[in-house]
Amino acid sequence: MADSDDEYDRKRRDKFRGERSDSYRTERRDERRPISSSGGARDEWNPFRGSSAAGGGGGGGARHRPDYSDYRSPGGGGPRARYGSPGREMPPAKRMRPDWPDEGMRSNPRFGGYDPYMMQAWNEHYQSLHYSHGGGHMPIARETSGPGIGNDTQTQPAMLTLKQFLDTQDENISDSEVMRKYTEYKTDFKRQQLNEFFVAHKDEEWFKNKYHPEDSVRRSDEQRGFLQRRSSVFVELLENGTIGSVKVDSSQADPLVRVLDMCVIKLEGGTDEDLKILDEKPKEPLVFERKIEPIQTTAALAAATATPKSPKKNENDNGVAVVVSPQKNDLKPVNSDEENWETDKKSDENDKNDNEQGDGDKKGGESSKKQLKKKKKTKKRKRKSSDDDDDESSSSDSESSSSSEEEEDEEELKKKYDVEDGLRTEQKAEQEKDKKEEEAIKAANVEEQPKAEEVQEKIEDEKEKVEEEPKPDVKTEAEAVAEPDAEPKKEEEEKAKEPEDEEKKPETEETSKMETENGESKEETKPTPEPAVESAPAADVIEMETETIDLDKVKDGPQPRALHRTASIFLRNLAPSITKAEIEAICNRSPGYLRVAIADPLVERRWYRRGWITFSRDVNIKEICWSLNNQRLRDCELGAIVNRDLSRRVRPTNGITAHKQVVRSDIKLCAKIAMNLDERFRLWVDEPAPAADGKGETATDATNGSSSGATTYGFNTKNPVLQNITDYLIEEASAEEEELLGLSGDQNDVEGEPIVRDEQLIAVLDRLLLYLRIVHSVDYYNHCEYPYEDEMPNRCGIIHARGPAPMKVTSNDIQEYIKSYEGKLQQFLTKTVLLTDDDIKDLGAKDAETEVEKFVQANTQELAKDKWLCPLSGKKFKGPEFIRKHIFNKHEEKVDEVRKEVQFFNNYLRDPKRPQLPEHPGTTKRPEFEPSRGAGGYRPAMYPPFGGLPYGFAPPMPMGGRGGGRGYQARRELPLEHQRRVIGYHDLDAPANSDRENAF
């Protein structure tokens, strides 16, 4: 269905109006003609007569109907732009924001004011090759936003082909001269691109860390320090047998993870005490959740442990939840306190009702009351065995019974009930004095907390002693107070409680007397079953108290630190102008900040970088992430998100790696990689560089199997992993036996052979694999290196191990696997050789003295005869030689900066893997399509070679459309075999002679 708006506009256009006949609705045409008009309707027809654009603003004319298009224009005046459907004028759908800003190619202060060298970097030498387009240069903004620039990747500008370059030269030039000039042009073009890239990025931190003469040395020393620290940790683990006890197999994921975590803890400065945290993994979630509890819960725990004068008061008041909650709800450590507080209150109310009934029965008679007490005790024991509710009822029991008669009855009952009754008497006596001691407790709350912990530790020791003794002999617990072994502990407890509470000592003595009486009465009666059951609640009370104190000790006391567990934040957008110090300044405001890592920029991301900020595990990482998202650094959004923990730290690889032949090949490759990396960072060697080069040569000879290299391969290095490595590099085979018996491997090649594991070779390989992974951050089975791992949140986070082995494997598969793996590891096997001085001269290397001379000449200005000015200081001199002397004496730091700048640029040129913009796709594909161009050719006058679309993928067509005209045609992109061939004419009447065939 056609669009109604477009149909309406089509009918209103002047193009169709003029083609209609005069007899076609003349009356309607008269209505549209202005009253004051005397000419034809076509001459004075104005499509915008309803708007202010009509001549004279419409004054003096009749009132006409406003144009329908005026109501649909975005600005309210004038017609809608005539392209597309009016539905496209609706607000555009919100698209997802990418990981980096879209305006990175433009100068926008929102993203740090970073403006990559779009058009300002072209040299004046190439400006002469720019040609005008329609009276001026092509509009850069429109061209850069075209479809060819939809990709985020920046590229170099397209380089002229030989044919295009020939069009710029004189017609009488010779072929040799053309080739010479074209070679010079390509060399100058490459120099220009390198120079522009250096100028654009020389002030950025990542670029300085690579090539600046001072910053690069500082960075390399820092990395070497990291490697030396890692190597020392590896040697320590190798000597104590930790490395040798683990195999790099996916089936041993847990031991591998443990070894990696041990390395991380050691790298973080941990001790052997901190390594114990690896055995306490189930306790980590509880400790972490307790630290993020609300403030009220933490205050309740602190109040429960900071009242040593009345430790049982917490059981009767709000402290009951603190004691019982860890035991009742072990599966919900976070919400256990809040949930149990409500249940404890309900149980307290029920126990008070039971106590009232007990008081009424007591008046009936003493004997009946004792029977009821026994029934209540039995009922409470049953509840204790199910869900520990008798502790709550016993505590509320003692709270309700406060009369003196009940105290006497309790003393008589304690002759039959041993431990629990003594504790109840102690609780009752303490509750009577709680009100008097409350003010003193609040005043000495902070000072008494450490003493309370000491007391509870001694109570815990007593509890352990009681648990070791047999349960039927519960009377020994009461008699233990009088024994010499228990007397010092009791005296220490009383001494610790004396400064806290003066009345605590009489209570202890009274309790000991009661326990002694209970012991004497127990010798007479000996109710063996009942005291055995009664002792359980008392021990549980002590155990619950100890657990509550332990929760606080985990937080406050010296405990193993989980240094291998961290929390981190990922920064998606970091402009190249942002430095690491600026990020550290922001992160230092947050608690628990450890380090920050910034990745190298990528051309695909328009040189924006990514970052990882590491914090300790016990911080509120989401709150810190929220605060970072609310901050802007140099008007750049950081894009902070919470970084998840690693999901799978041990990942399997092909199981064929366990085969003996593959293992032997892997040992060779690992040894080569280890020696190359050790030589690059000068590890394990104290000799100068030539000795290291000689060592590398011997390593190569040993790998090839030469006898001379084999004797010196392992002994030329102090690396303990590479010593005596040549014993495992020589292959063995039963060649003579197979020849005599006439055996051949053809049958095995067809059917395959089973995987053969050589445990001795695998042990040697595993040491090399762990050395590369721990020291050099190289994951061999993943054939990659994890860069800047010492600054990342997870050090030694991921490792690839041998997976399950297949049943059989052919020799062809083994050879293909070894060959492909060696190709993937070429980046580590080949040494990085810097370019020589002769090589960098062709790339535009600079000379320090020449640049200093240029600097002096640039700062020597002649004002008049015998009057010269130095712009650096503003002083005037009589001659240029005085200015030269002045610059070298007074501005020596400026001269040094010039020399450093020259060395900076030359270091960039020496790197064979230097970063630079990728070549233009048109430049790389040009040789394939160049012969297919027609005679029409390409005229640079129609298209500026560098101006219009410097970073596009497809060259724009200058004049014509997609078909004819000069320029690049559509089928130019097709290969030769897919293009149309020239249709020739063949005369059928001509004789069958190929020489006379004429093709037109």
From Swiss-Prot:
Organism: Drosophila willistoni
Full protein name: Serrate RNA effector molecule homolog
The organism's taxonomic lineage, starting at the top: Eukaryota, Metazoa, Ecdysozoa, Arthropoda, Hexapoda
Modified residues (Phosphoserine): S85, S336
PTM sites of type Phosphotyrosine: Y83
Family: Belongs to the ARS2 family.
Superkingdom assignment: Eukaryota
BP terms from Gene Ontology: defense response to Gram-negative bacterium; negative regulation of viral genome replication; primary miRNA processing; regulatory ncRNA-mediated post-transcriptional gene silencing; siRNA processing
Skewed-composition ranges (Basic and acidic residues): 8-34, 342-369, 412-441, 448-478, 486-527
Keywords carried by this UniProt record: Nucleus, Phosphoprotein, RNA-mediated gene silencing
Subunit structure: Interacts with cbp20, Dcr-2 and pasha.
Annotated gene: Ars2
